[in-house]
């Protein structure tokens, strides 16, 4: 609501229940249809900015006019949402200041808090296979699966039967495009250009970063085509980086958070972050709590992981790690963090 208010204050006109039906790029006219009363509204334009999501209507309209080189990579895992309701006293049933994960190797459950003292529980599971959504054809099979694999979560889900029956299984995937714009007439941003899986929680933030970058290029460029070309060149490496990190984070969350080597590396990561704040920042922190470009965080994250693996090789406990050698690796391989502006 705050964003809509800000948009209106800046002079934007908002039209609700309007679906992009078609675009005449030759005449520069977009046709919008109200699906409630079937009325159609032609709208002349100078340029179209498509922030209309993974199922973008503008992207579909652009397809005959420019080589989008569109590639969608399905995850082969789907998800179903359940709910932990408030406790009897109206409060949270479990700690709201944490991400709750039930990792099970090839699949997992997570729980995230909501403002109404509920939690949204999401089961991420392969679509096919021995343990998959295909292997849970009915409620009885689903309940038996939870009793076996998520026995401690099931008591938190008193409405499990209703939620499982009513909530659909949805798919996940990553969208890659070879081109985000049609000369100076249209450009895609956000999920319309680079939809990603949700495991880094950065889809919306990435789209907001797109908006800031596009605004800078529109202000500096002499025309729309130059602005769109520069915008895509700046943002593509960052979009590809966060798409890759989101996929990596899924494997980490479901399969590594209870691994001894991983836990030792995470412990050393925190130590090195305290000892070298100008050089070593955990990748998650770089992504979520700084304005470093995603591409920078991705590349530095690779170097940091190499350091952590090398420094902990043959170690069982943090006390076994040669911190002086780890310090030397940090200074030898990691340049100082670049200064960035918000």
Residue ranges of model-derived segments:
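C-terminal helical "tail/cap" subdomain of flavin- and related membrane-associated enzymes
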Residues: 216-342
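Active-site-adjacent segment of FAD-dependent monooxygenases/related oxidoreductases
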Residues: 1-6, 10
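Conserved mid-domain beta->alpha element of the FAD-binding
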Residues: 49, 82, 168-258
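Conserved FAD-binding catalytic core of PHBH/FMO-like flavoproteins
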Residues: 5, 18-22, 27-172, 176-181
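Non-transmembrane alpha-helical segments in soluble domains
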Residues: 4, 143-147, 215, 232, ...
């Amino acid at each position: 609501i705050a964003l809509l208010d800000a948009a209106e204050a800046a002079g934007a006109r908002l039209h609700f229940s309007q679906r992009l039906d078609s675009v005449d790029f030759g005449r520069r006219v977009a046709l919008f249809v109200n699906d409630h009363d079937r009325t159609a509204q032609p709208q002349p334009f100078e340029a179209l900015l498509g922030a209309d999501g993974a199922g973008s209507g503008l992207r579909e309209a652009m397809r005959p006019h420019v080589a989008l080189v569109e590639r969608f990579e399905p995850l082969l895992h789907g998800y179903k949402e359940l709910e932990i309701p408030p406790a009897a006293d109206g409060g949270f049933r479990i700690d709201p200041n944490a991400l709750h994960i039930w990792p099970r190797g090839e699949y997992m459950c997570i729980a995230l808090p909501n403002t109404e003292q509920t939690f949204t529980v999401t089961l991420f599971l392969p679509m096919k296979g021995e343990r998959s959504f295909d292997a849970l054809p009915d409620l009885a099979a689903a309940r038996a699966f939870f009793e076996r694999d998520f026995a401690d979560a099931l008591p938190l889900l008193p409405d499990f039967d209703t939620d499982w029956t009513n909530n659909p299984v949805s798919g996940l995937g990553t969208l890659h495009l070879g081109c985000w714009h049609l000369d100076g007439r249209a450009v895609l941003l956000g999920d319309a250009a680079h939809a990603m899986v949700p495991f880094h929680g950065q889809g919306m933030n990435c789209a907001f970063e797109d908006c800031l970058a596009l605004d800078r290029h529109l202000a500096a460029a002499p025309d729309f085509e130059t602005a769109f070309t520069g915008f895509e060149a700046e943002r593509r490496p960052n979009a590809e980086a966060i798409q890759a990190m989101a996929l990596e984070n899924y494997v980490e969350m479901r399969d590594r958070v209870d691994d001894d080597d991983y836990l030792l590396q995470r412990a050393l990561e925190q130590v090195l972050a305290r000892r070298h704040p100008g050089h070593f920042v955990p990748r998650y922190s770089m992504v979520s709590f700084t304005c470093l470009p995603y591409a920078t965080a991705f590349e530095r994250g690779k170097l940091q992981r190499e350091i952590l693996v090398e420094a902990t090789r043959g170690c069982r406990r943090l006390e076994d790690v040669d911190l002086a050698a780890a310090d030397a690796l940090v200074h030898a391989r990691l340049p100082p963090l670049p200064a960035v502006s918000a």
